[in-house]
């Protein structure tokens, strides 16, 4: 008797669209990661250094935001030192000196009014542990100390203060963001092939004395994941548009599809659930029980990339920067049916010609790997 599976039909049901069933999570490295950094002084002003033009002094000068430890002040190109107020005096240093840099001018910085120690939302601080903020008054850059209800600045070698000032803030009113010019670095990337895993099982019994063919249908919802983890923060609650080719890791090799544009409701990540169905027609020998299982293999890969990240703020202001990150994906490589060994469940004596109808245990049979789903 030929015990092969007579019919195997693999169907992909309910292909979900990103617009309909998209589940997302924000994809970013840390909550506080931005393009605004404190860079150690190196004798020259780095690109993107945050500055003001102080026209009160004569001659007028450009002052760059700097700090020594947590004390904010201004960096002078005349002596390559950070000048800051501390302990009633004007201090200056080039050793513990850091300059505030806004790489590619990506963060939208604004000066907003404060008074008597108050600071507006999203004010730029000098340290995470100390509540000292970057500020400026009529006479130049300084430090806002809310605990002392004022802005301190240097003047004629001394520490001076004022209750009227402006604080440096980051505008976070982003209404749209886009990622384009995505370039994957595939060299050295290995596709991690998952072990075949049983998703569903079903048992079919034949209590009769003749072989019968029974049809078994197994279904399983399997989730796939695509995520672009970038080094720059991805803002909550705004649409992210990603224009990129999509890496296909469903086989052992890695292929990049043609470029497509995708919109995500929150961040640059999506999870799609696809319903897979396996229908198997199995000849079941008399007085035997056969188990049919649905098996799936899921592949994973982490692929580094570089890209251009563009933000649009309320009011129409746009900023852009280069970024890098990792594309992480989980994809279904294949689903198939296994007909496992059959076991005897009845008494062969109940059937005439038992010796010719009762067979040995059924060997495991597999279906072929299905074709890739449409659109992948």
UniProtKB/Swiss-Prot annotation:
PANTHER family: NATTERIN-3-LIKE, NATTERIN-4
GO molecular function: hydrolase activity; toxin activity
Tissue: Expressed by the venom gland.
Protein name as catalogued: Natterin-2
Propeptide residue range(s): 19-27
InterPro entries xrefs: DM9_repeat, Natterin_C
Taxonomic placement: Eukaryota, Metazoa, Chordata, Craniata, Vertebrata
Gene3D superfamilies attached to this UniProt entry: Proaerolysin, chain A, domain 3
Post-translational modification note: Contains 4 disulfide bonds.
Keywords of the record: Disulfide bond, Hydrolase, Secreted, Signal, Toxin
Highest rank taxon of the organism: Eukaryota
GO cellular component, one term: extracellular region
Similarity comment: Belongs to the natterin family.
Entry's localization field: Secreted
């Amino acid at each position: 008797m030929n015990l092969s599976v007579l019919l195997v039909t693999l169907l992909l049901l309910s292909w979900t669209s990103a617009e309909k069933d998209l589940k997302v999570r924000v994809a970013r490295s840390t909550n506080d990661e931005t393009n605004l950094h404190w860079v150690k002084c190196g004798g020259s002003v780095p690109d993107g250094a945050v500055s003001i033009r102080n026209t009160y002094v004569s001659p007028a000068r450009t002052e760059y935001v700097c700090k020594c430890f947590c004390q904010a002040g201004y960096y002078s190109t005349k002596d390559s030192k950070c000048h800051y107020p501390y302990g009633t005096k004007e201090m200056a240093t080039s050793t513990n000196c850091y300059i505030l840099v806004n790489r590619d001018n990506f963060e939208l910085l604004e000066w907003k009014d404060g008074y008597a120690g108050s600071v507006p939302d999203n004010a730029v601080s000098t340290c995470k542990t100390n509540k000292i903020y970057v500020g400026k008054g009529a006479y130049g850059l300084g430090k806002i100390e809310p605990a002392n209800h004022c802005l301190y600045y240097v003047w004629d070698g001394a520490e001076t203060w004022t209750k009227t000032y402006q604080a440096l803030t980051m505008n976070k009113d982003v209404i749209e963001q886009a990622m384009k010019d995505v370039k994957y670095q595939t060299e050295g990337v290995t596709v991690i092939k998952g072990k075949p895993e049983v998703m569903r099982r079903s048992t079919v019994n034949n209590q009769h004395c003749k072989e019968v063919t029974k049809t078994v249908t197994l279904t399983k919802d399997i989730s796939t994941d695509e995520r672009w983890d970038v080094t720059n923060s991805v803002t909550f609650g705004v649409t992210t548009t990603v224009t990129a080719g999509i890496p296909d890791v469903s086989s052992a090799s890695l292929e990049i599809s043609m470029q497509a544009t995708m919109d995500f409701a929150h961040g640059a990540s999506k999870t799609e659930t696809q319903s897979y169905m396996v229908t198997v027609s199995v000849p079941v020998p008399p007085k035997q029980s056969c188990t049919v299982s649905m098996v799936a293999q899921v592949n994973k890969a982490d692929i580094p990339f570089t890209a251009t990240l563009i933000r649009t703020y309320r009011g129409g202001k746009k900023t852009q920067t280069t970024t890098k990150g990792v594309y992480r994906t989980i994809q279904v490589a294949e689903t198939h049916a296994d007909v496992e060994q059959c076991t005897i469940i009845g008494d062969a004596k109940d059937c005439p010609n038992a010796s010719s109808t009762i067979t040995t245990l059924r060997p495991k049979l597999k279906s072929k790997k299905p074709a890739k789903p449409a659109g992948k």
